[in-house]
Every structure is written in structure tokens, then in C-alpha cells.
Amino acid sequence: MRTLTFILIGAFLLAAPIVQAQDNSTDILIQVLLRKGILSESEASEIRQEVTAVAEAQKAEIVDAAVAQVERVYVSSPSVPMPSKLSNLTLTGNARFRYHYENAESRSGENNDRSRWRYRIRLGSIYQFKESAYSLGVQLETATSNDSNNANFGGFFDKSGGGMSVGRIYLNYKGEDWNITFGKQASPFYMPKMLWDGDLNIEGLSESISRGAWTFTAGQYIIDEENESKERIGGQSVTDDALLMAQAKWTNGEGLVFAPVLMATTGGNSNFSESGTFSGANSVQYFHDFAVAGLPFEYGFKTGNGQKHKLFGAWGMNLKGDELVNDPDSPFFGGSTGQSSKNQFANLGYQMGSAKKAGEHQWSAEYRFMEAGAYTPNLSDSDWAKGQLNQGGYVINYKQVFTDFFNLSVTYLVGDSIDDDYMASPGNKGNTQVLLIDGVVSF
């Protein structure tokens, strides 16, 4: 900026004396010619106007030349380049502001109303190694819960909820038609939100391979790390617990998708001796009797006016659901043995529109049904029914994308108990209602 100032000042200083000298010489000459009677007053006035016009043009030429010189200097000046080692780095992030209302009635009808203003921040980066199929991903997130990145406003301006935690850290290898990821990562599986909370980041190894219309995905994930040296006779198990998953996804390329999935845990009642406990909506530190088979699906299509539509859903069951609710040592135990038919889940929904670009909007309506022994609250959508099982109800959503960086959505979730006689804590609530109003800024 200092160089620009000096050049422009110099241009005006250079132009000023030239124009001034021309003006003085012209006036003296015109006065002499007038006194000798060679020029009339009208002729002298015309000559002055012509000389002034020429002088202004010369001054403009000098200034234009100076400006052109400045532009050449600044265009040719090299910009500060990104270090070569960071040239393959992609940065992402978003901030969400939320109004959150919830009420989960007890079976006696007692209300538990709560409303909060909340925020969430995610800052991510992916580094693609040069001339390599490997990439490294890192994401920082607010809060520490496994199924929520939300922090609350209202701590008298404190900063206790605004700390950043490592949400993802993973190494990925991407081949021509196969993919391997190790670390703390987003789920690679095609799952409805009812079965998989969007804030969960799994920890372990994921593999996928594509063959024509099929994509096969498998995963082996650590859910509890234990120190085997602490095992005591008659004490709790100190064996590491794992979640195993496998899925075969098929699509016809025209909007139809079927994706059968199998899920199972290897452990039982964990004590988290090394990793500490985890917090989540209605979380249960119990991983026994979980062997789930499910069939997520969707069908997307367009009508004659180009409007996008989608039907989606899932059906499945926990093959060990009856054992789960009949085991007196299980937190899912319903109070008496011999219980049955509590092991199924399902959802069915419809969406119109696709809110991905500025000016687009969508709305959707969905029915959900999840019995007491059908699944685990450790993985399911933490917003619906406050993570409760033994619930059936609806989810209605509207989303509008206003700009490339801002969207607004409103979601209403309502449910009620399926079996009023079931009183175990994972599914002992009555009517549940949740209202979410989200404003998201992406950058």
C-alpha cells in the first residue's frame, strides 16, 4: 500500500508542474498578441479553452500511465504460496445453533419438560498424501458425549461446555473399487437414523469393496477396552468388547436400494476399567444379547415436473431380544420371565424434495417402531424419544437451504410406549415429545 501511495503522489507531482508551466506560457503569449492587436478577445478565449483541454488530456495520460505501472507491479508480485506439504489439505467445518425442547412423561403422567438453547462446532481436515492412495482425517467437536456434540448456553457466560474434543482421527486407503479405514471414523454403513445416531464415530477397522451393483462393507470396532491384568476370580470380566458389522448394499442405479445388515457384540456387562464410562442419551453399559439383522431400503424417483421424492425405511429384529428382556441380570429385564415378542423394530418414511443447494427445500414424515428388546439405546437416534426403547411414534421434518453456507430445519419427534407394563429403565417412559429448531452455518 505504501508503494502504491508513493507512485500515485509522484504521478500527480509530475503532472502538476507540466500543466502549470503550459498554462503560464500560454497566458503570457496571448496577452502579447492581444496588445499588438493580432488577436481579438473572442479568439483569445477560444485559444485558452483549447490549451486547457490539451493540458487536461496530458494530465490524464500521465495519471493513467502511473496507475498502469502500479497494476503491473502488483500483478507481478508473487502471492504468499501455501507450503507444498499443505497443498493437499482440505478444511471443513460447521456451526449449529439449536433450540431444543423435550418432554418425557413418566408412566404416571408426570411431565419432565425442558427447553435449552444449544450450539455445536465441528472443525475437520483431510490430508491427501501426494501421489498416494492414503489420506489422514481429523475432526474436532464440541462436547464429549458419544452421541451428541451439543453444548448448552446459560452457564453465566462460562466456557465449560465449549471445549473441543477429538471426534475423528483416522487413516484411509482408497483403491479403485475398495476402501479401508482405520481409527476413529464416521460410519461407512447405510443405516437409517433411527438405528444409528448421526453423532456417533466408530473406533476400529472398516473395509468395503464394490462389485457392479453391489457394495460389501464390514467393520470390527472396539467398544470397551479392558486391562486383562486386573482380572480377579469371581470378579467382572476384563475382556475387551467389540461390535461386529457386515452389510451388502445393492442398487439398480435408478433410485432403488436394498442394504441388509448384520450386527453383533462380543461382550457382556462392561466395567470400562481403562477407558472410563461413556455418556449418551439413555446409555446402558451392557453389550450382551445383541445380534441384530435388519433390512434398510429406499426408493427415490422424480415426477413429471422434476420434483424429487423418496420412500425409505427398515425392518429387523434382535435375534437375542427375548433373552435380553428375560435375563434377571440384564438392565433390560422386564420384571418377570417368559416375556416374548419384544424383539422387532421398523420404520417407514416419505420425503419430498432434496435440500442440498441454495434455494432448495424438503420435508419428510416418518413412522418409527422399536420394541424393548429389539435394539440398544447406545446406537439409536438420541433425539427421538430421548433414546428410549419400547416406543412407537412419528418424526416430521422441514429443511430449507437459504444460501451455500446457511440452512434452517425444524424437526418434531413424538412417541409413546408400546408395552405399558414394561418398566425396565431403557424403555419405561410414556409419551415423549421433542422439538428441534436448527440453524447451520457451513464454512
Residue ranges and their predicted role:
Residues M1-T5:
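Positively charged n-region of N-terminal signal peptides that target proteins for export
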Residues F6-A15:
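Bacterial N-terminal signal peptides
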Residues L14-A15, V19-Q20, L171:
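Hydrophobic alpha-helical segments of integral membrane proteins
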Residues Q49, G255-F258, G304-L311:
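Short, structured loop/turn "capping" segments at alpha-beta junctions
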Residues K85-Y101, N112-R232, T239-T265, A346-L379:
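Outer membrane beta-barrel
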Residues E102-N112, G155-G161, S273-F443:
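Outer-membrane beta-barrel pore domains
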Residues G234-Q236, D240, A259-A291:
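A conserved mid-domain beta-alpha-beta active-site/ligand-binding segment of alpha/beta enzyme cores
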